[in-house]
From Swiss-Prot:
The keyword Ligase does not apply. This is DNA replication and repair protein RecF. The keyword Cytoplasm applies. Belongs to the RecF family. The gene is recF. It comes from the Bacteria. It is found in: Cytoplasm. It holds the Pfam family SMC_N. The RecF protein is involved in DNA metabolism; it is required for DNA replication and normal SOS inducibility. RecF binds preferentially to single-stranded, linear DNA. It also seems to bind ATP. GO terms for molecular function: ATP binding; single-stranded DNA binding. ATP binds at G30, D31, N32, A33, Q34, G35, K36, S37. InterPro entries: DNA-binding_RecF (IPR001238), DNA-binding_RecF_CS (IPR018078), P-loop_NTPase (IPR027417), RecF/RecN/SMC_N (IPR003395), RecF_2 (IPR042174). PANTHER family: DNA REPLICATION AND REPAIR PROTEIN RECF. Keywords: ATP-binding, Cytoplasm, DNA damage, DNA repair, DNA replication, DNA-binding, Nucleotide-binding, SOS response.
Length: 375
């Protein structure tokens, strides 16, 4: 797979931009807040259907504009595919593949795969559980585009059940009478989310452990574990549903007092440990960076295994966060086989060999320019 071009119109701070990609390595250099991350965000939007930096499409549209356009040309499996997404404030998106409008966003996923690694990804270790859940979901959206619908159904069921729990118009008896129906809906929607996350961790964990051993020299043992509220000794749907139903009954009184659902995949945790010690609490900054790097390289490898294509790698100002050893491990893993787009504020972070084999472009105030003159 190779990303040949990216076009932006009224996206973030880009009025109009056309990026042609001819090299396996592209370095975007510029000061902070010039638009480097915005360009990578647009690529990730086409790959996953969502932004990790914006809650609403309105935030992605240039100030004073009503809509934005993101498009790309991708070469994959011997074919060239044109992808396009139109964003409108407060309205549904329009997605096109090969010039044909698709009925749903799901139908436009699966043509472009990418792994994004930014300084914000250090929150995978030290951040809230939601950060780790979002990371899992982002991978699943690329491995199984239908997961978009699976996740949306759960979110809808969760919001509806929470609205019922918060209702001030229902008596305790009326609430107790209606909850079992909403319990069933929540459980049926939650089960496929939890089973997919569990299977993903089962496949990802050994890859991450191997990468971590390579980076750390085998001095530490890294473990990634899925920690839902229920036991996953039996992973079949019926067992998961039964366990969720039993836990809902246990939490019913507490849920009524708090007015929110306390059972489901929105409460899942992903445990990251080094030598059986929680990395979030006790890992040094260097250990945490090694851990995140191992997770990202494992993600890259898993996407290639499942899709049969090497995904695009987006590195957003992350090299400055890594020491020389970890930089070498990352850049060595990439080499020529992984198409990579890197953003940076300084070219001094790259060795001369890497620079010679890369296309260097400048980003300034939402404009893409020619390579800077050598010093």
């Amino acid at each position: 797979m190779f990303l040949r071009s990216v076009q932006l119109h009224d996206f973030r701070n880009y009025a109009e931009a056309d990026l042609e990609l001819t090299s396996p390595k592209t370095i975007l250099v510029g000061d902070n807040a010039q638009g480097k991350s915005n360009l990578l965000e647009a690529v990730q939007l086409l790959a996953t259907g969502r932004s990790t930096r914006a809650l609403r499409d309105r935030e992605l549209i240039a100030r004073g504009k009503e809509q934005a356009r993101v498009a790309a040309t991708v070469e994959r499996l011997g074919d060239t595919v044109e992808l396009e997404m139109i964003l409108r404030a407060g309205k549904r998106r329009t997605v096109r593949v090969g010039g044909e409008t698709r009925r749903t966003q799901v139908e436009a996923l699966g043509y472009l795969h990418c792994v994004s690694f930014s300084s914000l990804d250090l929150d995978l270790v030290r951040g809230a559980p939601e950060t780790r859940r979002d990371w899992l979901d982002g991978i699943l959206l690329q491995l199984e585009p239908v997961y978009t619908n699976v996740l949306a159904q759960f979110v809808q069921a969760l919001h509806q059940r929470n609205a019922l729990l918060r209702s001030t118009e229902l008596s305790p008896d009326a609430l107790a009478e209606q909850l079992p129906c909403w319990d069933d809906l929540l459980v049926r929607a939650a089960t496929p989310v939890m089973r997919r996350r569990h299977r993903l961790i089962e496949r990802l964990a050994p890859l991450a452990r191997r990468w971590h051993g390579s980076i750390s020299g085998g001095r530490e043992t890294f473990a990634v574990r899925y920690q839902p509220q229920i036991s996953f000794e039996q992973e079949d749907a019926q067992s998961v549903q039964q366990a969720l139903q039993e836990l809902l009954k246990e939490k019913r009184t507490l849920e009524g007092r708090r007015g929110t659902s306390l059972v489901g995949p929105h409460r899942d945790e992903v445990d990251l440990s080094i030598d059986e010690i929680p990395a979030r609490q006790f890992g040094s900054q260097g250990q945490q960076r090694t851990l995140v790097l191992a997770l990202k390289l494992a993600e890259l490898e898993l996407l290639e295994q499942v899709t049969g294509e090497v995904p695009l790698l987006l590195l957003d100002d992350v090299l400055a966060e890594l020491d020389l050893h970890r930089q070498d491990q990352l850049l060595g893993a990439i080499q020529e086989r992984v198409q990579t787009i890197v953003t940076t504020t300084h070219l001094s972070l790259f060795d001369s060999q890497w620079l010679q084999s890369a296309t260097v472009l400048t980003i300034e105030k939402g404009r893409i320019g020619s390579p800077p003159a050598p010093a």
